[in-house]
Amino acid sequence: MKFWLQQLGLAVLCASSAAARTAEHAYEFKSVAITGGGYITGIVGHPAEKNLLYARTDIGSTYRWEQELNKWIPLTDFLGPEDENLLGTESVAMDPTDPNRLYLAQGRYLSSNNSAFFVSNDRGATFTRYRAPFPMGANELGRNNGERLAVNPFKPNELWMGTRNAGLMKSSDRAKTWTNVTNFPDAAANGIGITFVIFDPQHEGTIYVGACIPGGLYYTTDGGKNWESIPGQPMQWDPSLLVYPNETQPQSAGPQPMKAVLASNGALYVTYADYPGPWGVAYGAVHVYNTTASIWTDITPNANNTSPKPYTPQAFPAGGYCGLSVAPDDPDTVVVVSLDRDPGPALDSMYLSRDGGKTWKDVSQLSTPPGSGGYWGHPIAEAALSNGTTVPWLSFNWGPQWGGYGAPSPVKGLTKFGWWMTAVLIDPSNPDHVLYGTGATIWATDTIAQADKNLAPKWYIQAQGIEETVTLAMISPREGAHLLSGAGDINGFRHDDLDTPQPMFGLPVFSNLNTLDWAGQRPEVIVRGGPCGHQYPDGCGQAAYSTDGGSEWTKFQTCIKGVNTSVHNPGVMTIDASGKYVVWTSAMYVVSPSVQAVTPPANDSGPYASSDWGKTWTSPRGLTVQTPYISADRVQPKTFYAFSGGVWYVSTDGGLSYDAFNATKLGLPAHTGAVPVVSVDRAGEIWLALGSNGVYHTTDFGKRWKRITHKGTVADLITVGAAAPGSTKPALFIRGSPGHPKKSDYGIYRSDDNGSTWDRVDDDDHRYGGFNLIQGDPRVYGRVYLGTGGRGLLYADIVPGQSDKEGNVPGTGGI
């Protein structure tokens, strides 16, 4: 299949201009330090500029390593919610002739028509943006491969891009416009497509291209006028790999190229697998091609060429290979990493060769203390930054909840050496410095040469500054830790210190933590819920409560109907002011890009109530819908609220029964629903964010409502924070746009006068792809916590003595 595409680029200058603000005070933005928290899909280093490294992620965009600050710097925080799809990097390209030039191919999903190229002349401090004429898939299958985007070292204004469904593309004007290379033999338009483009820096016109199909390697020696399949490339699986062919068959007819590196001596190293990855891979191989002699050699690590010997018995199938790096100054120094041996044994391994793949050292095995039973891992004490700051959550509390990818090490005291280790780099400016990414973080060593002596390199975490979590829940109680959070994939945290990584919540450990709440008059009592694949014999693995502010947890005795080990989302939990009555609904809601309720299939009851920590659950009278729009009064015990389908519900008996009121008779718009947001210190005071209907407020438990915002206001989310000094009115924060009387951009706003006037909190440089959740702090005036869909968790504080005319400031990033 061949394509021809050309599109004029619409250039937009991003990141550097000051934003118009309405705020009286400037804000400082900081990351709540989790450190990592997501999948690192690629790490690249400039071939000539020392310490110039970039890390790309699937849903958190790209970071640049800043050596003087000893941290990674996010490059695309200017992206707003309308560009959430651009907060994922498909590929990174550096100009080998100019270290200041950087190119990012942005776009999370093929289903979106919003993909773009970001072009920088200052290492990502500012970008010019050009719309891409084809979709990208930074969070799709095959995101572990690459790099798809490459700069011609002989014509540095020329870029080539291997796409997922539009074939091989070429730009001669630095990504402004693109044309299809129509004579390329196979567009491989299978949704994975062409996964890497490599220029030979020693021979002008020679380009190597790989597609994720068997026999997918091609080359040209005349700048793309003519293409040939690389002769002799592996086309069929080695029969010796298929030890039990009737048990697990390869998913491809032959090896599929994953990544490739052209060494300085002309050797082309290629990793292979039977599936695009990062999951689902069962078989793989590593080969090297002598481009001068046109000879292929199988250099796959095996029992005959690897030291220490592979662990036996090894789980079958043995996985594939993806991660690959070659030392620029030594073409025989190679690192490869296996893919998808998890859950083992033996787990995925990093292999180091000093002789071009003739022999290998199993670095993962050497790095693991004796007696692990093939479950390679770092001692948990190594899960720390180079300055000693620990990242304790990487233990995953050794909780039996996931199984498979990302599961905690089965060996207590170890954290897995890694999974999805598809991003690996021998630092071009320091070959003893090796970095590799996982599904959660970046590990690094400065002593990889220890493996040559069959010793363990010293490892540390080099992910500081990278914050990639998806925030699913937040609370800020009146006492104890200022913030507790729930995240996608990594459970949740009690943030005793916002600026250093914290331990993960204890058992039961959830993969996601979707719901949190605290008791208004007993803030040390907290409930949480999330999916858990482990069946506990002594309680419900999907819900827990704490009576000490979130340090220790106890499982609920039973789950509500519809929540079990196979349910991915456990719904919403809330607890009354006394800390004795819990209401739990199996419905959920999503808030990005808009607030939308999702009701469960079995919708035969209202939210269930319990006063004995889940020993018994009662279906209520008066509310027969599993609505997610529920909350508890923070002051009056046994009082719960719900607003769903244009009906306002109130319970004063611990959720056993509800009185229902037609919204229009109370002063509310018809056919609406939202989470009731309650006052921290006044019974019956509630706010509702009703989208284009604005914000409504009541002080009498919902008997009478009043719209407090101007006509034209949009408010999708609302939260309550501490009152301004000298005021009795709590600060309100909304995600939306106040509209009239002053036209405003969509963002985060604060009101100190109950909605009469609004000040802008965020600005055009601090948008982070939009915010899934917002949470005010009842103890710190002006502070708001901001949960994102891939850029972690942030908090914004007013800068003392600085007006907004002086500008918002980025802060320290948490570490």
Swiss-Prot record:
Primary location group: secreted
A GO BP entry: cell wall organization
Pfam assignment, any one: BNR
Record EC number: 3.2.1.150
Coiled-coil zones: none
Signal peptide bounds: 1-19
Keywords carried by this UniProt record: Carbohydrate metabolism, Cell wall biogenesis/degradation, Glycoprotein, Glycosidase, Hydrolase, Polysaccharide degradation, Repeat, Secreted, Signal
Active site: D58, D489
A single MF term (Gene Ontology): oligoxyloglucan reducing-end-specific cellobiohydrolase activity
Entry's localization field: Secreted
Enzyme class, UniProt record, top EC level: hydrolase
Reactions it catalyzes: Hydrolysis of cellobiose from the reducing end of xyloglucans consisting of a beta-(1->4)-linked glucan carrying alpha-D-xylosyl groups on O-6 of the glucose residues. To be a substrate, the first residue must be unsubstituted, the second residue may bear a xylosyl group, whether further glycosylated or not, and the third residue, which becomes the new terminus by the action of the enzyme, is preferably xylosylated, but this xylose residue must not be further substituted
Name assigned to this protein: Probable oligoxyloglucan-reducing end-specific xyloglucanase
Organism: Neosartorya fischeri (strain ATCC 1020 / DSM 3700 / CBS 544.65 / FGSC A1164 / JCM 1740 / NRRL 181 / WB 181) (Aspergillus fischerianus)
Record lineage: Eukaryota, Fungi, Dikarya, Ascomycota, Pezizomycotina
